[in-house]
Amino acid sequence: MRLHHLLLALLFLVLSAGSGISGPLSCRRNGGVCIPIRCPGPMRQIGTCFGRPVKCCRSW
């Protein structure tokens, strides 16, 4: 029965990891860069890198 709880927790962890860009590695994997200010000119925000203040920006 403990194995079921472990597998369920692992499933939730995997599903929550794919719910958006939340780190610099996943930002780079999606073709973006981490910028601590507003995304400049031709770039648009596709997520965050280190929480709310740092944006993950990508060119159109």
Swiss-Prot record:
Q: Which PANTHER family match?
A: BETA-DEFENSIN, DEFENSIN BETA 4A
User: Which gene does this sequence derive from?
Assistant: DEFB11
Q: Name one GO cellular component term.
A: extracellular space
Which UniProt keywords are listed? Antibiotic, Antimicrobial, Defensin, Disulfide bond, Secreted, Signal
Enumerate the Pfam families for this protein: Defensin_beta
**Which Cys-Cys disulfides exist here?**
C27-C56, C34-C49, C39-C57
For whether the record's keyword set contains Secreted, the answer is yes
The protein depicted here goes by the name: Beta-defensin 11
- Tissues in which the UniProt entry reports expression: Neutrophilic granules.
